[in-house]
C-alpha cells in the first residue's frame, strides 16, 4: 500500500514539474510569436521585392510553427495531459515546408523533403482513421 501511495506521489510531483515546464515553454513561445509578428511587420514594409517575399514567406511559416507549438501545449492541458499525435505531424509537415522554402537549391533534396511530407500526410490519414483515433 505504501509503495503505491509513494509512486502516486512521485507521479503527481513529476506531472506538476512537467506542467510548470510546459507553461514556461508556452510563455517563451508567446514572446517569440510576438517578436516574429514585429519582424513580419518590418519585412512587409521593406522595398526590396525579391528578398522581401522570401523573408515574408519564411517568417509566416515560422509564425505558424510557433502557433502550432502553442496550440499543442493548449491541447495537452485540454485533453487531460496527453499530446495528440496529429499535432506533432502538423508541426513536422510545417517544418519540412519551411525547409523547402529556405533550402530549395538542390532538386534531389527537395524531392526527398516532398516524399517526407507525403509520408507524414499518409501517417496523418492513418492516425485519423476510426481504428486509431483516440479523441
Curated annotation (Swiss-Prot):
Annotated disulfide bonds: none
One BP annotation, GO? cellular response to phosphate starvation
- Residue ranges of the TM segments: 20-40, 54-74, 82-102, 107-127
Stored InterPro entries: P_starv_induced_PsiE, P_starv_induced_PsiE-like
Membrane topology, from the record = Multi-pass membrane protein
Q: Which GO terms describe its cellular component?
A: plasma membrane
Keywords, alphabetical = Cell inner membrane, Cell membrane, Membrane, Transmembrane, Transmembrane helix
Q: Which domain of life is it from?
A: Bacteria
Q: State the compartments where it is located.
A: Cell inner membrane
Is this entry keyworded Transmembrane? yes
Q: Which PANTHER family match?
A: PROTEIN PSIE
Family statement drawn from the similarity comment of this UniProt entry: Belongs to the PsiE family.
> Could you tell me what this protein is called?
Protein PsiE homolog
Amino acid at each position: 500500500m505504501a509503495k503505491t501511495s509513494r509512486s502516486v506521489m512521485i507521479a503527481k510531483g513529476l506531472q506538476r514539474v512537467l506542467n510548470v515546464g510546459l507553461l514556461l515553454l508556452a510563455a517563451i513561445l508567446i514572446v517569440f510569436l510576438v517578436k516574429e509578428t514585429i519582424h513580419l511587420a518590418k519585412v512587409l514594409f521593406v522595398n526590396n521585392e525579391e528578398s522581401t517575399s522570401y523573408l515574408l514567406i519564411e517568417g509566416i511559416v515560422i509564425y505558424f510553427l510557433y502557433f502550432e507549438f502553442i496550440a499543442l501545449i493548449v491541447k495537452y492541458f485540454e485533453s487531460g495531459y496527453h499530446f495528440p499525435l496529429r499535432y506533432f505531424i502538423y508541426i513536422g509537415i510545417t517544418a519540412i515546408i519551411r525547409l523547402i522554402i529556405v533550402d530549395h537549391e538542390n532538386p534531389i533534396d527537395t524531392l526527398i523533403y516532398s516524399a517526407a511530407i507525403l509520408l507524414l500526410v499518409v501517417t496523418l490519414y492513418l492516425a485519423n482513421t476510426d481504428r486509431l483515433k483516440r479523441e
